[in-house]
C-alpha cells in the first residue's frame, strides 16, 4: 500500500489527486461536527452578499452561507460517490462472471442483456425510479450504479475473458478449485488496472450526474445539502450573482478531475506493464 501511494505521489497528477481527495475527506469529516454557520441560518437582508471575512464565499439567495452549504454538501457527495462505486462494482463483476461463464448459454445471454440495457440513459433510469421513491440520493446512487455497472461489465469482459481462457485458470479448475474462487483469485486480479480506472471515473461521473439530476428535480431532495443542490438553486440567478454558481461548479470540477487523475495514477502504479518495479518483483 505504501509503495502504491508513493508511486502515485511521484506523478504530478497523482499529487493533485491525493491533495484534493484528501481535502475532500477532511472537509466531509469536519462538517459532521462544525460548519461556519447553521444551514438553517438565513437572512433575506443579506442575500447574494459578496465574499467577506464573515462569509468567505459569500451568501446565496436566502442569505445562507455558501461555504457552510458546500462543506455539508461534500458529505452527501462523498456518500453518493462511494456507494455508486460499490453498486457499480457489484453489478459489473456479477455480470462479468456471467459473461465469462463456462456455460455458453449463460455467457451469450448475459452479453445480449448487457448490450440491450446499456443503451438506457442514466436520466431515464432516475426518472423511472423517482416515480415510486421520489427525489433522493438513493435514486441517484441506484441509477448511476446500474448504468455504470453495465458499462463496467462491457469494458472488463475482454480482459476477463482472456484470463478465463488462460492455462493457469484451466489448471486451477482441474485441481478442484470452485468457479467462484477462480473468478476472484485469478480473473478479477487481471482486470484490476482497468477496474480501478473505470471505478474512479464512475465516482467522478456520479458527481456530475448528481448535479444534473438534482437540477432536473430527480436528484437529492429539497433541503438536502449537496453540490448539485447548490448549483441548481443558484444557476437561475447567475445574472444576479455569478459567484454563487462559481463556487460549487469549481468544487465539482476540481474533485472530478482529481478522481480521474487518481484512477490513471493508480492504474500505472498497479499495472506491471507501466510499473517497472512490479515487473522486476515478478
List PLM regions with ranges.
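Transmembrane-helix boundary motif in ABC transporter permease subunits
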Residues: 31-34, 80-115, 127
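N-terminal signal-anchor/first transmembrane alpha helix
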Residues: 1-37, 113, 191
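Generic hydrophobic transmembrane alpha-helix motif, especially the helices
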Residues: 56, 60, 101-162
